[in-house]
Amino acid sequence: MVKSHMGSWILVLFVVTWSDVGLCKKRPKPGGGWNTGGSRYPGQGSPGGNRYPPQGGGGWGQPHGGGWGQPHGGGWGQPHGGGWGQPHGGGWGQGGGAHGQWNKPSKPKTSMKHVAGAAAAGAVVGGLGGYMLGSAMSRPLIHFGNDYEDRYYRENMYRYPNQVYYKPVDQYSNQNSFVHDCVNITVKQHTVTTTTKGENFTETDVKMMERVVEQMCITQYQREYQASYGRGASVIFSSPPVILLISFLIFLIVG
């Protein structure tokens, strides 16, 4: 009888917890205004004023009709009619216009989950549209079908890349799409970089390079796929509703 009541209360607690989590997910995030931290791209005004000051109708050193050091008709050290340290008539750190802002915009907060994911996946390469550079690999031993190409590869393999460029696996529908994109961007970047140094590649070089990079891209996909699968499983089993459900099932089995 006692176990039956305990099982009922645990079931009710599970339903309440699950509902609360669902409601939390549906609640809209509060919108952020200027300097509230809600904007992903905060304002770019400099703390000392506008980088390009407005051009009013006053003479040299007399913006907006005021005297020397008197912008907008205020007294000495009183911009826009406010007191000392009060731009635009506001208090200290309460600028009222698009220029002359005193308080710095708050920096956007970076989620630790995103930082950890980026560190685990690889370093993002600037200027390549979100591509990441994988860790160094050993160049695979490949047989090309004839002695000449096999010997040529062994003698020139050091000239081919040992790292690949790639995007997260969740942006592709299958392995083939990932590998195709990975090979294209890696061969292109390596060819351009090497050509600027005065070294050119022959058709044989490009053919062998594509084969080598293809094998490395397949290896990179397998690594990223396994890592992504592991992170997804850990997130699922660490959520409170799942933990409560597992505990309830264990209680029913043991009881």
Curated annotation (Swiss-Prot):
Propiece residues: 234-255
Q: Which residues are glycosylated?
A: 184, 200
Q: Which SMART domains match?
A: PRP
Cite the binding residues for Cu(2+) 4.
88-90
In which residues is Cu(2+) 1 bound?
64-66
Record region (Disordered): 27-110
Cellular component per GO?
cell surface; cytosol; dendrite; endoplasmic reticulum; Golgi apparatus; inclusion body; membrane raft; nuclear membrane
Membrane protein topology class: Lipid-anchor; GPI-anchor
Query: sequence repeats located where?
Result: 54-62, 63-70, 71-78, 79-86, 87-94
Q: Where is this region: Interaction with GRB2, ERI3 and SYN1?
A: 25-233
**Top-level taxonomic group:** Eukaryota
Residues that bind Cu(2+) 2? 72-74
> Lipid link (GPI-anchor amidated alanine) located at?
233
Pfam families named among the record's database cross-references: Prion (PF00377), Prion_bPrPp (PF11587), Prion_octapep (PF03991)
The entry's localization annotation reads: Cell membrane; Golgi apparatus
Q: Does the keyword NAD apply?
A: no
GO BP annotation list? cellular response to amyloid-beta; cellular response to copper ion; cellular response to xenobiotic stimulus; intracellular signal transduction; learning or memory; negative regulation of activated T cell proliferation; negative regulation of amyloid-beta formation; negative regulation of apoptotic process
Q: Where is the composition biased (Gly residues)?
A: 55-99
Q: What terms describe the molecular function in GO for this protein?
A: amyloid-beta binding; aspartic-type endopeptidase inhibitor activity; copper ion binding; cupric ion binding; cuprous ion binding; glycosaminoglycan binding; identical protein binding; microtubule binding
Q: Which of UniProt's keywords are assigned here?
A: Amyloid, Cell membrane, Copper, Disulfide bond, Glycoprotein, Golgi apparatus, GPI-anchor, Lipoprotein, Membrane, Metal-binding, Prion, Repeat, Signal, Zinc
Query: What InterPro entries has UniProt attached to this entry?
Result: Prion, Prion/Doppel_b-ribbon_dom_sf, Prion/Doppel_prot_b-ribbon_dom, Prion_copper_b_octapeptide, Prion_N
Role of this protein? Its primary physiological function is unclear. Has cytoprotective activity against internal or environmental stresses. May play a role in neuronal development and synaptic plasticity. May be required for neuronal myelin sheath maintenance. May play a role in iron uptake and iron homeostasis. Soluble oligomers are toxic to cultured neuroblastoma cells and induce apoptosis (in vitro). Association with GPC1 (via its heparan sulfate chains) targets PRNP to lipid rafts. Also provides Cu(2+) or Zn(2+) for the ascorbate-mediated GPC1 deaminase degradation of its heparan sulfate side chains.
**Which pathological condition is tied to this protein?**
PrP is found in high quantity in the brain of humans and animals infected with the degenerative neurological diseases kuru, Creutzfeldt-Jakob disease (CJD), Gerstmann-Straussler syndrome (GSS), scrapie, bovine spongiform encephalopathy (BSE), transmissible mink encephalopathy (TME), etc.
Question: What is recorded about the protein's domains?
Answer: The normal, monomeric form has a mainly alpha-helical structure. The disease-associated, protease-resistant form forms amyloid fibrils containing a cross-beta spine, formed by a steric zipper of superposed beta-strands. Disease mutations may favor intermolecular contacts via short beta strands, and may thereby trigger oligomerization.
User: To which protein family does this belong?
Assistant: Belongs to the prion family.
Name it: Major prion protein
Origin species, per record, is Camelus dromedarius (Dromedary)
Biological classification of the source: Eukaryota, Metazoa, Chordata, Craniata, Vertebrata
